[in-house]
Amino acid sequence: TKAHVGGMAYDTMNQILWVTGQGSTWAQANAITLSHLENYSFDDGYHPIEFDMSYNLYKIKRASFMTYHDGALFVGFFTQDNASVIEKYLINADGTLYEKEDMNLKRTVGVTDPVAYAVSMQVISGKVQGMAFYNNKILLTRSWGILPSEVQIFNYSRYGILSTSEAYK
């Protein structure tokens, strides 16, 4: 699978840890509540912790990295050369992800987990491995192999392509 533990985000409003994942055909966002984490003990049966919620992510190819900002999960995927995307998934007041009411995707594609619907998408350059928000800015980290790593900084309000040529740095 292409998902990795680098894809983690913490929802401070609902106290939920989100982790990227990959289902049989869909990228996923999986959730564990803080209370579940605090009450979990590996010594009680030697079993991995189970997710409290799992969502198939509609529209995104893979979930390589994610971050939480202002009531939403931003999920992106890593590509070596091609442009990639970041999708924005809204978090409801109860901590669940937004599902478009008229979507009948679960039955159509044969999945049992809920299908979260992205409300917006940003095109980004390849080699992005992480994302953060700071003072109305989007920070993207880019790295691959022995090449120098970099942090690209964009205005948060900017829509469209977040390409290397548009970055402050």
Language-model-derived ranges and their functions:
Residues 17-23, 75-79, 140-145:
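Conserved beta-strand positions in repeat-built beta-propeller and related beta-rich domains
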Residues 6-15, 58-75, 79, 124-134:
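Structural signature of eukaryotic scaffold interfaces centered on beta-propeller domains
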Residues 60-112:
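Hydrophobic, aromatic-enriched interface-forming segments
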Residues 25-38, 81-98, 146-163:
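Structural motif
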Residues 2-49:
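Long, hydrophobic, well-ordered secondary-structure blocks that form the structural core
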Residues 115-169:
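Loop/turn-rich, solvent-exposed surfaces of beta-rich toroidal or solenoidal domains
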Residues 2, 54-59, 119-124:
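Surface loop/turn motifs at the tips and blade-to-blade linkers of beta-strand repeat domains
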Residues 1, 36-53, 93-116, 158-169:
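Beta-strand initiation motifs
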